[in-house]
A protein has these predicted regions:
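Phosphate-coordinating catalytic segments in nucleotide- and nucleic-acid-processing enzymes
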Residues: 32-305, 310-312, 385-408
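Switch/communication elements of ASCE P-loop NTPase nucleotide-binding domains
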Residues: 1-39, 275-406
Length: 408
């Protein structure tokens, strides 16, 4: 597949033609390098703590229970803070690490026998190549998105995911290859990334909120996109002045969704999870009692309202027409068009509903952004389906999707 996202892109096709696979690939390509510095720091800290914990337990009988719990964490903190603030040279890491450990052990009456073993491991951790970390975390992200089934089942072909972002100032490109579900980064390693992708799958994330409150096992079976989506719904962000101004401009859409469709909003309850507050009845409505069609509007309202979706991000919606009457399909299409037109958020939508696809096409024309629309249809080619650009002839989509009605 070769997909362009200049504004709103629709991928149409029958069930089982690979639409969701493309959506997952876009999601992984955009997000795999997100917060790379934070991931590396967390991994370094955890690895150093593990080494220190094992070494300290082997050499010491702790009388102080709090010291037993905290010693390895405090030591790791001291080492990493000094490493970053003093900008240690590679040749200095061993000696400085050894000094910190010896001083800590002396101050806390701890045995520092065989100190060479943990120091060598810590030096190895801090000297690890950046490219190794990026390779590990990018592959891990793809594996989690695809549940360890990245390559098509039953084929030995190598898969490629190429991601390119072009704007007025620069061009960013990254590529990965996947062979036997193992990933390799092609070309230059990229670590900086500002945009974010949010993926709304066909099931409703709100149904998992009640499971979290009840400690249900079902909550542990969430996909990675849904886990990230739930986190975005529940987050409370500290915004900069510029971000605050942008968020305030976004409130027009939030207000319109609440006023015309949801008549309520999500809010945190005393347990720290979220609930839906219905303005009409002035009370809480259980998610299991909400209209299924109402949930996607509620999710979009929250994502825009709490600044989880911001200018330049990518919103991916998988078959959003599920549980929606054609009237609400049109309403959703208009909201998605406004999200792009007014907020500058790119939208990728998979669909097999001719109503929804036509509504996107019409609303983009109404909002004078039709040129930023792309339409693809999944066509069978030998043993696979390929995406075909039908932007100039969307009737191909409608002819195929209306065909079952013609058979009646």
């Amino acid at each position: 597949a070769c997909i362009e996202l200049p504004g709103i892109t629709v991928i149409a096709g029958l069930n089982g033609t690979g639409k969701s696979t493309i959506a997952k690939s876009v999601f992984a390509a955009v997000n795999a390098r997100k917060n790379m510095a934070g991931k590396i720091r967390k991994d370094q800290r955890q690895s150093i703590e593990n080494e220190l914990e094992e070494w300290l337990e082997q050499n010491n009988d702790f009388d102080d229970i709090m010291l037993f719990f905290e010693a390895h964490e405090e030591l790791a903190q001291h080492i990493l803070e000094a490493y970053e603030s003093e900008k240690w040279e590679k040749g200095d890491i061993y000696g400085k690490t050894e000094n910190i450990i010896e001083e800590y052990c002396a101050n806390n009456n701890l045995d520092n026998s065989d100190i060479e073993a943990p120091v060598k491991e810590i030096v190895s951790i801090l000297n690890r190549n950046l490219d190794e970390y990026v390779q590990f975390f990018v592959e891990q992200y793809y594996q989690n998105v695809f549940k360890n089934q990245i390559n098509p089942i039953g084929t030995g072909r190598t898969a490629f995911v190429d991601y390119k972002k072009v704007d007025a100032e620069r061009e960013i490109a990254s590529s990965v290859s996947i062979q036997k579900n193992r990933l390799s980064i092609i070309g230059k390693i990229l670590t900086l990334q500002q945009e974010n992708a949010i993926y709304i799958e066909t099931h409703s994330v709100l149904d998992f909120c009640q499971d979290l409150g009840r400690r249900s096992n079902r909550a542990g079976r969430m996909t990675l996109p849904t886990r990230e989506l739930l986190s975005n719904l529940m987050t409370e962000r500290e915004l900069t002045f510029t971000q605050q101004q942008e968020q305030e401009r976004n409130q027009k859409i939030v207000h319109d969704i609440a006023e015309n469709i949801t008549h309520g909003h999500l809010q945190k309850n005393k347990n720290g999870t979220i609930e839906f507050w219905d303005e009409g009845v002035n009370g809480k409505i259980e998610f299991s009692n909400m209209s299924a069609g109402l949930k996607i509007f509620t999710v979009l309202q929250q994502l825009i309202g709490n600044y989880s979706l911001k200018r330049g991000d990518v919103l991916i919606v998988d078959e959003p027409e599920v549980n929606l009457h054609p009237t609400w399909q049109i309403a959703l299409a208009e909201i998605l068009v406004r999200i792009y037109k007014e907020l500058g958020i790119y939208v990728l939508a998979n669909s097999h509903s001719p109503y929804f696809i036509r509504a996107i096409e019409v609303k983009m024309a109404e909002y004078e952004c039709a040129l930023q629309g792309r339409y693809y249809f999944m066509k069978q080619d030998e043993n696979a389906y390929i995406s075909t650009d039908v932007t100039e002839n969307t009737n191909e989509i409608y002819d195929a999707l209306y065909q079952p009605l013609n058979l009646l």
